[in-house]
């Protein structure tokens, strides 16, 4: 298990992706990335309280996970654009989501940076809005992704086909 760092200190965790799942929180959709080994994190108990424990997953807002992966995995942006355009042209019938991420990320080596935050600390949203954390937790950034050789070969082949004249 990765060790926890002091508050606001960044910890680095190296893991292998086992699965990407999708679930609903009632109002929103989230992607849960499950890893091969546990590390410290906060999980909600039966009473709705968040407790520090060992976890083997991280939940992401879909757009955040997709954006981080697009910025790191070479060729994934082309697959995303092709699927997104197909979705737009078919009135949203197809698109890019958890299934595509599962296909690309399964067995990928991933390096995460995690920063601890405490309840009551302020943070700024992507819209520039200042908010306050309601409970202790970690903010997580994906620093590096090494997809399997098979996946990278497929992405490279797709790029080669796009560049053929």
Residue ranges and their predicted role:
Residues 1-5:
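N-terminal acidic, proline/glycine-rich, low-complexity intrinsically disordered segments
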Residues 14-17:
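Structural detector for short beta-strands of small beta-barrel domains
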Residues 29-31:
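Short aromatic-glycine-enriched beta-strand elements
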Residues 39-148, 153:
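Acidic, low-complexity, intrinsically disordered interaction modules
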Residues 160-165:
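Short acidic DE-rich linear segments
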């Amino acid at each position: 298990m990765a060790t926890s760092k002091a508050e606001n200190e960044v910890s680095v965790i190296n893991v292998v992706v086992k699965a990407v799942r999708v679930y609903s929180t009632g109002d929103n959709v989230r992607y849960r990335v499950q890893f091969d080994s546990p590390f410290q994190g906060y999980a909600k108990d039966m009473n709705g309280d968040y407790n520090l424990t060992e976890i083997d997953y991280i939940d992401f807002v879909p757009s955040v996970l997709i954006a981080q992966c697009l910025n790191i995995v070479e060729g994934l942006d082309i697959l995303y654009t092709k699927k997104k355009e197909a979705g737009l042209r078919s009135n949203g019938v197809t698109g890019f989501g958890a299934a595509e991420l599962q296909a690309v990320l399964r067995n990928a080596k991933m390096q995460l940076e995690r920063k601890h935050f405490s309840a009551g600390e302020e943070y700024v949203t992507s819209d520039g809005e200042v908010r306050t954390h309601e409970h202790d937790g970690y903010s997580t950034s994906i620093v590096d992704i090494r997809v399997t050789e098979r996946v990278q070969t497929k992405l490279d082949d797709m790029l080669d086909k796009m560049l053929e004249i």
